[in-house]
Amino acid sequence: MGLETEKADVQLFMDDDSYSHHSGVDYGDPEKFVDSGQDRDPHRLNSHLKVGFEDVIAEPMNMHSFDKVWICSHALFEISKYVIYKFLTVFLAIPLAFTAGILFATLSCLHIWIIMPFVKTCLMVLPSVQTIWRSVTDVIIAPLCTSIGRICSSVSLQVSHD
């Protein structure tokens, strides 16, 4: 009872002259780009999103639905996941890619032209600030702490048991 899964063996036969021998992607021919089978997540950023039917729906051994229900629900899950994803990417992928491009371009510009020069300026000025801070602590804070220490050292407590 349940869905039996088999691994299919798929082979692709191509003539030597039907594809280009260079390793780059030819963006001029959209048909080759669509069917290139390239890895669109080479750094595995979204490996956690590879969710199958068995990862979401699971029936214990003693509780099984009818085989037809299981097969139909599995098929409906996969089809709806595929169709809804394609539908959402048609409407959202280009605007979100454009927005993300603007965001990352803005952040890169701010980092390159504002943040890093500010950090480098602070690091250049820091030795001077360190010298001034050491002088301030030697002239003001050290004598103040020494005086407070001498005052507190002369305090004595006597405990009497009555």
UniProtKB/Swiss-Prot annotation:
Membrane topology: Peripheral membrane protein
Segments passing through the bilayer: none
Subcellular location: Nucleus; Cytoplasm; Golgi apparatus membrane; Cell membrane
Predominant cellular place of this UniProt entry's protein: nucleus
One GO CC term, this protein: nucleus
Molecular function per GO: D1 dopamine receptor binding; molecular adaptor activity; protein kinase binding
PROSITE patterns listed in its UniProt record: CAVEOLIN
Residue numbers of Phosphotyrosine PTMs: Y19, Y27
Keyword Transport attached: no
A GO biological process held by the record: endoplasmic reticulum organization
Keywords: Cell membrane, Cytoplasm, Golgi apparatus, Membrane, Nucleus, Phosphoprotein
PTM annotation, UniProt: Phosphorylated on serine and tyrosine residues. CAV1 promotes phosphorylation on Ser-23 which then targets the complex to the plasma membrane, lipid rafts and caveolae. Phosphorylation on Ser-36 appears to modulate mitosis in endothelial cells. Phosphorylation on both Tyr-19 and Tyr-27 is required for insulin-induced 'Ser-727' phosphorylation of STAT3 and its activation. Phosphorylation on Tyr-19 is required for insulin-induced phosphorylation of MAPK1 and DNA binding of STAT3. Tyrosine phosphorylation is induced by both EGF and insulin (By. similarity).
Sites bearing Phosphoserine, chain numbering: S20, S23, S36
Cytoplasmic compartment segments: 1-86, 108-162
Intramembrane segments: 87-107
Highest taxon above the source species: Eukaryota
Subunit structure as annotated in this protein's UniProt entry: Monomer or homodimer. Interacts with CAV1; the interaction forms a stable heterooligomeric complex that is required for targeting to lipid rafts and for caveolae formation. Tyrosine phosphorylated forms do not form heterooligomers with the Tyr-19-phosphorylated form existing as a monomer or dimer, and the Tyr-27-form as a monomer only. Interacts (tyrosine phosphorylated form) with the SH2 domain-containing proteins, RASA1, NCK1 and SRC. Interacts (tyrosine phosphorylated form) with INSR, the interaction (Tyr-27-phosphorylated form) is increased on insulin stimulation.
Similarity field: Belongs to the caveolin family.
Role of this protein: May act as a scaffolding protein within caveolar membranes. Interacts directly with G-protein alpha subunits and can functionally regulate their activity. Acts as an accessory protein in conjunction with CAV1 in targeting to lipid rafts and driving caveolae formation. The Ser-36 phosphorylated form has a role in modulating mitosis in endothelial cells. Positive regulator of cellular mitogenesis of the MAPK signaling pathway. Required for the insulin-stimulated nuclear translocation and activation of MAPK1 and STAT3, and the subsequent regulation of cell cycle progression.
Name of the protein in question: Caveolin-2
Chain's gene name: CAV2
